[in-house]
A protein has these predicted regions:
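Charge-dense, helix-prone N-terminal extensions
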Residues: 1-126
Length: 126
């Protein structure tokens, strides 16, 4: 992508059609789990923020699509992610085998709970 995307729609418009279909499904699952989350572009990726904090991101690479829920969810849901290529904070998957919506929702809800706990802790310190 030569120009920086201004929105997730703009980001998706520049992704190849096969990967776009997988990422649209991923976006829908994220939105269903976090309807109050704000869409944005962060570090060149399609991302979501909730209550001012990073929630999750996703993107397309040359040979795969990727979902970025952060390190903790990848570790906690390791057994459910065994069929995917993972590394700290990243889940890679082929465009023709998108992540199941139920698993995405579970990961997003875990991140929402993490952010909520962090926000409560931050509030107590003030």
């Amino acid at each position: 992508m030569k120009t920086k995307p201004k929105s997730i729609d703009d980001y998706l418009a520049h992704v190849s059609p096969d990967k776009r279909a997988a990422l649209v499904k991923l976006r829908q699952a994220i939105r269903s789990a976090a309807p109050k989350a704000e869409e944005c572009i962060s570090y060149g990726l399609a991302a979501f923020r909730l209550d001012g904090r990073f929630l999750v991101a996703f993107g397309a690479a040359a040979n795969h699509c990727a979902f970025y829920p952060g390190g903790s969810p990848v570790a906690v849901f390791k057994s459910e992610l065994k069929n995917y290529d993972t590394s700290k904070g990243t889940i890679r998957f082929p465009a023709d085998k998108p992540l199941p919506a139920a698993l995405v929702r579970k990961l997003v809800k875990f991140r929402i709970a993490q952010n909520s706990a962090a926000n409560k802790l931050r509030s107590k310190k003030r």
